[in-house]
Amino acid sequence: SLTEIVQESVLTAIVFIHFLLAWRYKAMRYCNILVGGFFLAMLIRELDALFDLIAHGSWVWFALIAALLALIHPVIHYRQTLHQLAQYTRTPWYGLLISGLLAILVFSRLFGMQALWLAILDGGYVRVVKNVVEEGCESFGYMLCLTASIGYFCTFRETLAQKSY
C-alpha cells in the first residue's frame, strides 16, 4: 500500500542519515551507528512481506544480523559510545526522536488493538477505521523520527562547521 511505501521510504532516509553521519563524522560515530542500526532493524521488519518470499518469518534473522553488526563497534568502544549517547540525549532532537518512537512502538500498537475498538464502538466496529488510525499514528511517529534525524543532521553539520573556523 502507499502508506507502507511511504513508511519504508522514511525509514530508509533515517537509516541513510545516521549511517552517513557515522561515516563522515567521528565525533558521534558510535551513537549514529546504534541509531542507524536500530532503524535498519525496524526497516527490515517493515519489509517483512519481501523477506517472506525467502521464508516465512525470515525477516527476524536479517534484523538480528543487522542489529548485531550495528553493535560490534559501539560495544568495542563502549566508553566513547556512552559519552556520545549522553551527548545525543542533550539535543532537542533526542526528545523528538523518542516521541516518534513512542508513537510508533506504543500508541500505534494500542490503537491497533481490536479489543479497544470493540469496547469503544461496540456493534459499530469497522476494521478499516482501526487500520486508518493505527497506520496514521505509525506514520506520524515515523515523520517525527525523520524530522528529528534531519534536524540532528543539520545541527551537527553546523556545529562542526563552527568548530572548524
What are these regions (language model features)?
Residues 1-6, 125-139:
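Short aromatic-rich membrane-water interface segments that cap or initiate transmembrane helices
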Residues 106-119, 133-162:
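C-terminal transmembrane-bundle signature of multipass membrane proteins
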Residues 1-10, 30-33:
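Structural signature of hydrophobic alpha-helical transmembrane segments
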Residues 26-37, 92-98:
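Membrane-interfacial loop-to-transmembrane alpha-helix junctions, especially the N-terminal start
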Residues 36-90:
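Membrane-proximal helix-loop-helix units in multi-pass membrane proteins
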Residues 7-20, 63-77, 136-152:
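Hydrophobic cores of alpha-helical transmembrane segments in multi-pass inner/ER membrane proteins
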Residues 19, 92-107:
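Hydrophobic alpha-helical membrane-insertion segments
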Residues 42-52, 103-122:
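C-terminal ends of transmembrane alpha-helices
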